[in-house]
């Protein structure tokens, strides 16, 4: 009888201990349930553009269409020769069909013009020879000396290899986010838990500045939420 009472007391004591352990675990879980930190991770690179599209527009004006057409062809040939002399290939050069404007055909046009027709065309260079294009742009004044009227000249630079940089930059952004979260956890007397949510990451490509559009600034920002533990 005495042994039965001792056994019952022991079982009750064990039950109380287990109950206390479960209660403590539940309280700890409840306390940690809503503890989290959301941080951003940043990765940046500066890289040279690896693709450029350069458009050069030229025009001639006058009253004799056949002569104007010949004059436009002459200017186009001079531009193409200039481009090839600066290291660009025929396959990288495209000449658009000429565009003709008849000023007399415009109802709102002025009648005191010294010429009737404007014939224009655009020569486009698409290449990965960024350095050669940059040099040619600085030398395009040579075309003016040859009598070529450049109406407009615009170069658009790109970084086409961006997709290859994404994994490396994303990994760096995540690493930086984790580092920030660990610093926050340490300052809060907590330890960093698992990732609760993670953003895909926002990628941006911009010119480094307005004077060097051929230098690109790559930027990726990721947002991650970590749990915190006591």
Model segments located where?
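Short, charged, surface-exposed interaction patches
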Residues: 2-9, 15-230
């Amino acid at each position: 009888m005495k042994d039965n009472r001792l056994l019952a007391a022991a079982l009750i004591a064990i039950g109380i201990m287990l109950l206390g352990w479960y209660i403590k675990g539940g309280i700890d879980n409840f306390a940690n349930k809503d503890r989290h930190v959301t941080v951003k991770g940043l990765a940046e690179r500066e890289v040279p553009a690896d693709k450029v599209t350069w458009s050069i527009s030229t025009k001639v004006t006058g009253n004799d269409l056949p002569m104007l057409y010949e004059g436009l062809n002459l200017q186009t040939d001079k531009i193409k020769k200039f481009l090839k002399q600066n290291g660009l290939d025929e396959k990288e050069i495209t000449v658009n069909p000429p565009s003709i404007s008849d000023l007399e055909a415009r109802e709102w046009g002025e009648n005191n013009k010294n010429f009737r027709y404007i014939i224009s065309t655009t020569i486009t260079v698409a290449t990965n020879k960024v350095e050669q294009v940059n040099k040619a742009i600085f030398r395009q004044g040579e075309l003016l000396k040859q009598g070529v009227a450049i109406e407009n000249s615009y170069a658009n630079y790109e970084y086409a290899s961006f997709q290859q940089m994404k994994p490396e930059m994303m990994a760096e952004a995540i690493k930086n986010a984790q580092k920030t979260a660990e610093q926050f956890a340490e300052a809060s007397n907590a330890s960093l838990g698992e990732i609760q949510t993670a953003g895909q990451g926002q990628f941006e490509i911009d010119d480094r500045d307005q004077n060097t559009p051929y230098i690109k600034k790559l930027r990726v920002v990721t947002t991650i939420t970590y749990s915190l533990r006591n």
